[in-house]
């Protein structure tokens, strides 16, 4: 196939768009691959659409290889099924909701577990029909509060979502690992650098869950890994390695002290080190010796706000992502002045476990707050703290919560070493959902014994349109985009940098020969300066660039590798065959 740039619907830009934050966003706009229509909404122009379709085809081929069958469900969905699973409420403001002229409620699909479950239930009724894997490649909709980074986080995006249905847990596990391996093949073919991490299931539900994160400094997801063992997890899924519980016998009694002007951890530590506390004789008091109580209110879907206190060591901040994952599907918010006024037993800056538990406030603590651990914390009165308050003796929390930040150097949950953090972009997520959705819709079939058998289910997603940006993010250089051959809009970009009629005719013949050899060719036949053409070729990012320029008079053309920058001269006679051989690898 030959595409002439003189006819291509394309306009490149010399300057970065003012609202672009990350390299992929800047370059995809500048190179004319996409154009913004509104916040988080983009049009796909010819070059961008070619990349998107090639990624879809890689995904499709690997899904077909594991026996998955492609279908297409509507994006406009009725409220009923999502009400049944409570996700009409759980999704909150993320869901695009609308009504038809008869005031019936609908949504634009963010994901399709409900509809796939109902589809399979409606078609199959016997254990003999299973296992089944169905998938679609379809546009999804989520009302992101802060769309950012171009197509990395938009309100409309293309996703591959597949769903496995089995009659037993062994079948589910097999489907899960089939997808896991297929995803690894997909990302290898796309040239994406990624890591597989343990993850939380969130609103999707289910048990086992893993994310595929593309390594990137602009990623929104923080993950940690242990070099020694290979352990890796999304920060929300990290389980704290708690110390051993300690006996409480023989520990000093807790004592309340006047601590003027100490509403923060820093001022409290400063006071403690000046107070010559007997428990800390011979060592310096640090923030890790203090217990910080963070006050929140939470609300289950459709419920009322309730108070919650979270206790964490004072040297740690509460990580809102971990907190949100631990509380999901409930939402949470920090207390405001009105909340404190309505609950006068909460003394801002001096809250301790006693007032919380005396007043029935649910109190969850970090796993490091083990039985027998001793703390400096608030005494529930202005300018007063208690020293030596012992967990399990002086207070008993209602449970533990994984809400404290995870830091570099923390012990790995597997005990093999320490954790280091990095950032990534979620490109895939796989779930063993189990029977959450099949229970909701009573998706039963007749088992071998003639009795009803509840199906079990897996859900597996890949961000197809996001992968366009991820590849651009990982592969670009200072000159522009650089597409791997598996997804490049064209195999080769032929640039005529010579106004000589013979050179132009020779370039056209070379392009025709490459086309006959089965290559997709972008032919820059425009009446523009060589400098403009070269800059566009580097910006657009085809993996190979052929220059028909000054060397034509000497019977040679130039072949450039866009990734390495290496160039070689090739004899004009028979150039197409030699170039084709190089392109074939």
From Swiss-Prot:
<dbReference type="InterPro" id="IPR045864">
    <property type="entry name" value="aa-tRNA-synth_II/BPL/LPL"/>
</dbReference>
<dbReference type="Pfam" id="PF00587">
    <property type="entry name" value="tRNA-synt_2b"/>
</dbReference>
<keyword id="KW-0648">Protein biosynthesis</keyword>
<dbReference type="InterPro" id="IPR023717">
    <property type="entry name" value="Pro-tRNA-Synthase_IIa_type1"/>
</dbReference>
<dbReference type="InterPro" id="IPR036621">
    <property type="entry name" value="Anticodon-bd_dom_sf"/>
</dbReference>
<dbReference type="InterPro" id="IPR002314">
    <property type="entry name" value="aa-tRNA-synt_IIb"/>
</dbReference>
<dbReference type="InterPro" id="IPR006195">
    <property type="entry name" value="aa-tRNA-synth_II"/>
</dbReference>
<dbReference type="InterPro" id="IPR002316">
    <property type="entry name" value="Pro-tRNA-ligase_IIa"/>
</dbReference>
<comment type="similarity">
    <text>Belongs to the class-II aminoacyl-tRNA synthetase family. ProS type 1 subfamily.</text>
</comment>
<dbReference type="GO" id="GO:0006433">
    <property type="term" value="P:prolyl-tRNA aminoacylation"/>
</dbReference>
<dbReference type="GO" id="GO:0002161">
    <property type="term" value="F:aminoacyl-tRNA deacylase activity"/>
</dbReference>
<dbReference type="InterPro" id="IPR044140">
    <property type="entry name" value="ProRS_anticodon_short"/>
</dbReference>
<comment type="subunit">
    <text>Homodimer.</text>
</comment>
<keyword id="KW-0436">Ligase</keyword>
<dbReference type="InterPro" id="IPR004500">
    <property type="entry name" value="Pro-tRNA-synth_IIa_bac-type"/>
</dbReference>
<comment type="function">
    <text>Catalyzes the attachment of proline to tRNA(Pro) in a two-step reaction: proline is first activated by ATP to form Pro-AMP and then transferred to the acceptor end of tRNA(Pro). As ProRS can inadvertently accommodate and process non-cognate amino acids such as alanine and cysteine, to avoid such errors it has two additional distinct editing activities against alanine. One activity is designated as 'pretransfer' editing and involves the tRNA(Pro)-independent hydrolysis of activated Ala-AMP.</text>
</comment>
<keyword id="KW-0547">Nucleotide-binding</keyword>
<keyword id="KW-0832">Ubl conjugation</keyword>
<keyword id="KW-0963">Cytoplasm</keyword>
<dbReference type="Pfam" id="PF04073">
    <property type="entry name" value="tRNA_edit"/>
</dbReference>
<keyword id="KW-0030">Aminoacyl-tRNA synthetase</keyword>
<keyword id="KW-0067">ATP-binding</keyword>
<dbReference type="GO" id="GO:0004827">
    <property type="term" value="F:proline-tRNA ligase activity"/>
</dbReference>
<dbReference type="InterPro" id="IPR050062">
    <property type="entry name" value="Pro-tRNA_synthetase"/>
</dbReference>
<dbReference type="InterPro" id="IPR036754">
    <property type="entry name" value="YbaK/aa-tRNA-synt-asso_dom_sf"/>
</dbReference>
<dbReference type="Pfam" id="PF03129">
    <property type="entry name" value="HGTP_anticodon"/>
</dbReference>
<dbReference type="InterPro" id="IPR004154">
    <property type="entry name" value="Anticodon-bd"/>
</dbReference>
<feature type="cross-link" description="Isoglutamyl lysine isopeptide (Lys-Gln) (interchain with Q-Cter in protein Pup)">
    <location>
        <position position="173"/>
    </location>
</feature>
<protein>
    <recommendedName>
        <fullName>Proline--tRNA ligase</fullName>
        <ecNumber>6.1.1.15</ecNumber>
    </recommendedName>
</protein>
<dbReference type="GO" id="GO:0005829">
    <property type="term" value="C:cytosol"/>
</dbReference>
<dbReference type="GO" id="GO:0005524">
    <property type="term" value="F:ATP binding"/>
</dbReference>
<dbReference type="InterPro" id="IPR007214">
    <property type="entry name" value="YbaK/aa-tRNA-synth-assoc-dom"/>
</dbReference>
<keyword id="KW-1017">Isopeptide bond</keyword>
<dbReference type="InterPro" id="IPR033730">
    <property type="entry name" value="ProRS_core_prok"/>
</dbReference>
